[in-house]
Design a protein with these regions (language model features):
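Conserved class I S-adenosyl-L-methionine
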Residues: 48-57
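Conserved SAM-binding loop of SAM-dependent methyltransferases across substrates and taxa
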Residues: 58-70
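S-adenosyl-L-methionine-dependent methyltransferase catalytic module, highlighting the catalytic core
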Residues: 4-15, 60, 79-125, 129, ...
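Phospho-regulated, low-complexity intrinsically disordered regions of nuclear gene-regulatory
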Residues: 387-393
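Conserved SAM-binding motif I beta-strand of class I
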Residues: 73-78
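Conserved alpha-helix/loop element of class I SAM-dependent methyltransferases that forms part
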Residues: 30-49, 64
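Class I SAM-dependent transferase core
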Residues: 2-31
Length: 393
């Protein structure tokens, strides 16, 4: 539940008109961004594949996490169906995602439902986040919350954040930070609850927070308190998860999938494009050398590669090891007016080597899109073309 950052970065929800500008506490970055960045840092550190955000609201956290390359399944759950439908499109792939596909598949799904209902589609997750959620639960739902999230879903890691009520006296005219909050806990109250839940469901927990207090008020602690729960022994095995009976109580209101290199058609597009660009770069770099040969022609292959790998001021920067690998690979050559680039040469370039494991794989993917030599060992291109004459290479 992100706070609006209006006249300052105050965390006081809905009370901006009551907070004098000169006395309002400012957080830079705004507190909601600090919370989301905290989660993102955890994702960067632990690299979970399956992540769910319970009480996802306007999907701000999901939009931040979707760019992380390790995540393959991203789920949001919220009780407000209209908000999910309104914000769903912001999670869809953009044109740039098709031009530069991810390495791994990514599916994003938004579910309408209550966080205290059991849905088997959220079993087996690596990380579940509950950011500023539990304070919105009434006593009955709060009692059921651990049973569902810790007991039934039982992910590897759970992150729960909630307001620290000890910080509230630093805000003018504030008792609860949001009119929908059912409670706000002190650090002792939150930690007592968290330790009890962790012990009952076999988790360990550590405490931290975001939103540092102003000088002289360090004793109140962070404005937002955070508990990080780790499942002892890791998450449930796939076999255990599959034994659970299917329970689909949530309503899927939005789902989308991102293009990735795991999908054959996108992998081919990327590889063909990378090969074409590298061949063109090599061809253009050798045109001046070719002109120095005074128009000499013949069927005998001419090694025009030189001893050094070409380095463009606008191109990638290679390490010494990468340069050596390129220099030691088979060099481009000419036969008549044709320019040949061995596949082994292309595989020496880091970007292409990352895409293709070997020559046979590269040949099988590009063969019907890029001209190859008769033995299939090299890409063939015209040495000169119309544009070379126009731009006087």
């Amino acid at each position: 539940m992100a706070e609006n950052n209006l006249q300052c970065s105050s965390v006081v929800d809905g009370n901006f008109e009551e907070v004098p500008r000169e006395t309002a506490i400012q957080f830079k970055p705004p507190l909601y961004r600090q919370r989301y960045q905290f989660v993102k840092n955890l994702v960067d550190q632990h690299e979970p594949k399956k992540v769910a955000d319970l009480g996802c609201g306007d999907t701000s956290l999901l939009r931040l996490l979707k760019v992380n390359p390790c995540i393959e399944l991203l789920v949001g759950v919220d009780i407000n169906e209209d908000k999910l439908r309104w914000r769903g499109d912001s999670l869809a792939p953009f044109m740039g995602d098709f031009l530069k596909p991810r390495d791994l598949n990514l599916t994003i799904t938004l579910y309408h439902g209550s966080v205290v209902e059991r849905d088997s589609r959220l079993l087996g997750f690596d990380l579940i986040t509950c950011i500023e959620l539990i304070e919105h639960l009434d006593s009955g739902d709060l009692a059921r919350f651990p049973e569902v999230v810790f007991g039934y879903l039982s992910p590897s890691m759970i992150v729960i954040s909630t307001p620290n009520s000890e910080f509230n006296p630093l805000f003018p005219s504030v008792t609860l930070r949001d009119s929908d909050h059912k409670f706000e806990w002190t650090r002792m109250e939150f930690q007592t609850w968290a330790l009890y839940v962790a012990n009952r469901y076999d988790y360990s927990v550590e405490f931290t927070g975001v939103g540092e207090p102003p000088a002289g008020a360090e004793n109140v602690g962070y404005c937002t308190q955070i508990g990080i729960f780790h499942k002892n022994g890791g998450k449930a095995t796939e076999a255990c998860v599959s034994e659970q009976h299917d329970q689909h109580v949530y309503k899927a209101v939005f789902t989308t999938s991102y293009p990735s290199l795991q999908q054959e058609r996108f992998f081919k597009l990327v590889l063909v494009n990378e090969v074409s660009q590298q061949v063109e770069s090599l061809r253009v770099s050798h045109l001046p050398r070719r002109k120095e040969q005074d128009g000499e022609r013949g069927d005998k292959p001419k090694d025009i590669g030189g001893s050094k790998a070409p380095v463009s001021c606008f191109g990638p920067v290679f390490t010494e090891v990468e340069k050596a690998k390129i220099e030691n690979s088979p060099k481009p050559f000419c036969v008549g007016d044709k320019f040949f680039v061995p596949l082994q040469r292309l595989l020496a370039y880091p970007r292409l080597n990352r895409l293709c494991a070997n020559e046979e794989m590269m040949r099988s993917v590009i063969a019907d899109s890029i001209p190859l030599s008769s033995d299939g060992s090299a890409v063939v291109a015209d040495l000169c073309n119309y544009f070379d004459e126009q731009f006087e290479f």
